[in-house]
Amino acid sequence: MYERILVPTDGSDVAEAAVDHALDLAERYDAEVHALYVVDIDSVNFSLGTEQVDRLKQGRFDEMGELKERADEATGAVADRAGERAVDVVEHVSGGRPHKVIGDYAEEHGIDLIVMGSHGRAGVRRALLGSVTERTLRSTHVPVLVVDYLEED
């Protein structure tokens, strides 16, 4: 049923909840997991200089130590957990608008399922904040499994 499962990650608790589900499915269906870290170029434009933003747009993440370290840590955590279950994993880092990068990656790599986390927000708060998950759902033809993450009070 599933041969390739994409799990976008930023290393957050929300993303980690999705990783658990992605790995469970991969183990069950003997699927390969793709761990994708997306650098949101729109949000870093304001905090970085022009040269840094150009590096991001060109995908030259190796030249940006702290960013590369964060990305490797997030995708590496998925790879480590996958290794414990004998699940094959592909790690990838890309820059752009997250929902677009996720959708494009899924189509370019023949992904059968995208597994994403979402904060358990509702009502006006969700509408005002928007979400990468919601935008991804609206912009891709690949099935998306949304894993709700509710923070404990």
Q: Whereabouts are the PLM-identified features?
A:
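Small/aliphatic-rich secondary-structure junction motif
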Residues: 3-53
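Conserved beta-strand positions in the Rossmann-like core of class I SAM-dependent methyltransferases
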Residues: 34, 90, 145
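A short acidic, glycine-rich active-site loop
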Residues: 54-73
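Structural beta-alpha unit
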Residues: 80-114, 149-153
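Gly/Ser-rich helix-loop-strand patches that form or flank binding pockets
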Residues: 105-153
